């Protein structure tokens, strides 16, 4: 595959860069198509991404419809058929600025002003379209073989919510039609697994713009799953000596100034509220409250490690374009804990956290994950607490502990929390890009900021080390992950309805009611479908919509024999004694058997 660089030379594209170049060229072709259809369009940035490409564009008051996106894609195909040569050229600063001003590319002009040290700028031209770009690109538009516009969303200029909201148009591009077809098949699977779709079908949660974007509400079925997850992780934590607390969802601005969140995390926080001369803010995380709980009384080295846990409600001002059901919202519940320990206890505490993470993943059959040591970017003084010695000590300590524990990890710069490095455990869901579920963060910063101490063996006051950790992460996100992994077919212990009783006719309704009552007494979540519908309809509803683990199909034969006909998710049917069936289900519930 031939590509052209900004200096004009043509060469074979390195194989590992082919998709990037294809997608970057697709972004330019899409921008050209947009400009043809909307001459007043003003373009911002249009890069290739891991999975495709996008262009952020200012369309004034124009709101694009699905039909408009289809027309843009149609125009892109015209441009590829025109087989326009893609040619680079370079201009000195003054001429480059003049060119962009003449073409009314205001965002490009502003971007050039930001690049104050640059004396010249490179451009690529195809037909009438010119874009400021460093390349490389395909040599002709016809070389772009397979692409598709996928969606539009909003994006702030320079990712700053104080700036104008632009229209972001996304697309994908591949080497050939076969790859595009395979991608579309994957997308169909993604749509079928989407937790928002399944959540609506199963009545797990809902959203409403009147309540607010990014503020999902759990319905009875969904809250049942949520509570089971809460019970599961609390049991695990109690067995390890955790002490559970409950703290308020708000705090004073001064609390977050003390912690450093106000300086380093304010853009992700909701605006402050003024009450009786005091400023309050919804909390984005729980560390400051837990620091204050530790500070509530004096501590000795004998008290440590002290493990404080909470299922805590948090609020973050996520941009509207990033919101996604319960996977990412503006309100969520964090499986949070803070472990206060001595420096000598760091290794054993990190080891215990890691063991709990991996034990939990085994319980939920999570196998596709990777560990990342997230470090600060030393050049970013705004994002991170400015103490080089503290950072070097913390990063080296966590790196050494992970190495000693034999945990394979990669390192990523710029992904640390503002107060310390962290171990992130990223999962690869059934569909979509990986994201972080679990985390363990090492912190020498906040204990000092809150003047936390303990009396050591020698009688002197020392500052404890804090481990911030989340095993399930956000319960909301963890639930979204499980929904998409299982397609809503939760294991018996998690299922909102564990058994559905289906009388074949009204004649067996009384027997069905008796069986239902017996299951309820055994602690099983059961629902009786007494609608006057054909049994086939009831089975489909229970299996495809409610996705229950077990159905009891009760006809005259079962009523006469006093047993039950059991149908599982696979469609296999067996006849069992009632007590035998109850023993089977209660065993799965008690042992939290992962049988989806």
Q: Language-model segments: what does each one mean?
A:
Residues 1-42, 50, 56-596:
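NTP/phosphate- and nucleic-acid-binding module
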Residues 45:
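Conserved P-loop NTP-binding catalytic core
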């Amino acid at each position: 595959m031939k590509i052209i660089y900004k200096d004009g030379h043509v060469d074979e594209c390195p194989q590992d860069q082919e998709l990037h170049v294809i997608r970057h060229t697709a972004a330019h072709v899409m921008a050209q198509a947009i400009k043809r259809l909307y001459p007043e369009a003003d373009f911002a940035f249009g890069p290739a991404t891991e999975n495709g490409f996008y262009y952020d564009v200012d369309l004034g008051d124009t709101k694009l419809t699905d039909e408009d996106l289809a027309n843009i894609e149609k125009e892109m195909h015209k441009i590829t058929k025109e087989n326009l040569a893609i040619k680079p050229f370079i201009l000195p600063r003054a001429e480059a600025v003049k060119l962009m001003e003449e073409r009314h590319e205001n965002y490009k002009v502003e971007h050039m002003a930001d690049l104050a040290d640059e004396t010249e700028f490179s451009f690529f031209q195809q037909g009438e379209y010119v874009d400021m770009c460093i390349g490389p690109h395909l040599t002709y538009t016809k070389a772009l073989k397979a692409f598709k516009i996928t969606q539009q969303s909003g994006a702030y200029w320079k990712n700053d919510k104080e700036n104008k909201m632009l229209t972001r148009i996304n697309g994908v591009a591949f080497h050939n039609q076969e790859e595009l077809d395979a991608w579309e098949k994957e997308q169909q699977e993604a749509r079928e697994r989407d937790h928002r779709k399944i959540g609506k079908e199963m009545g797990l949660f809902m959203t409403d713009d009147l309540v607010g974007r990014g503020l999902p509400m759990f319905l009875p079925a969904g809250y049942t799953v949520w509570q089971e997850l809460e019970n599961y992780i609390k049991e695990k934590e109690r067995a390890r000596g955790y002490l559970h607390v409950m703290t308020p969802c708000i705090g004073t601005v001064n609390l977050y100034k003390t912690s450093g969140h106000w300086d380093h995390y304010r853009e992700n926080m909701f605006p402050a509220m003024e009450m009786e001369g005091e400023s309050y803010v919804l909390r984005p995380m729980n560390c400051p409250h837990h620091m204050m709980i530790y500070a509530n009384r004096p501590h000795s080295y004998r008290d440590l490690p002290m493990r404080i846990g909470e299922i805590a409600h948090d609020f973050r001002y996520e941009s509207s374009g990033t919101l996604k059901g319960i996977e990412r919202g503006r309100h969520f519940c964090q499986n949070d804990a803070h472990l206060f320990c001595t420096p000598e206890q760091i290794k054993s505490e990190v080891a215990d956290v890691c063991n709990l993470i991996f034990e939990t993943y085994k319980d939920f059959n999570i196998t596709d994950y990777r560990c990342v040591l997230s470090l600060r970017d030393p050049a970013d003084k705004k994002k991170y607490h400015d103490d080089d010695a503290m950072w070097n000590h913390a990063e080296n300590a966590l790196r050494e502990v992970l190495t000693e524990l034999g945990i394979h990890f990669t390192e990523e710069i710029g992904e640390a929390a503002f107060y310390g490095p962290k171990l992130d455990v990223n999962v690869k869901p059934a569909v979509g890009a990986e994201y972080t579920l679990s985390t363990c963060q090492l912190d020498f910063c906040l204990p000092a900021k809150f003047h936390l101490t303990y009396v050591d063996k020698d009688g002197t006051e020392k500052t404890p080390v804090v481990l911030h950790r989340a095993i399930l992460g956000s319960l909301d996100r963890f639930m979204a992950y499980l929904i998409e992994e299982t397609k809503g077919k939760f294991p018996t212990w998690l299922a909102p309805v564990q058994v559905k009783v289906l009388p074949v006719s009204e004649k067996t309704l009384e027997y069905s009611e008796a069986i239902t009552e017996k299951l309820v007494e055994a602690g099983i979540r059961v629902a009786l479908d007494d609608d006057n519908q054909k049994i086939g309809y009831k089975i489909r509803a229970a299996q495809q919509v409610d996705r229950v683990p077990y159905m009891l199909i009760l006809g005259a034969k079962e009523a006469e024999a006093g047993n039950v006909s059991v149908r599982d998710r696979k469609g296999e049917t067996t006849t069992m004694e009632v007590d035998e069936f109850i023993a089977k289900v209660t065993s799965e519930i008690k042992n939290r058997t992962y049988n989806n």
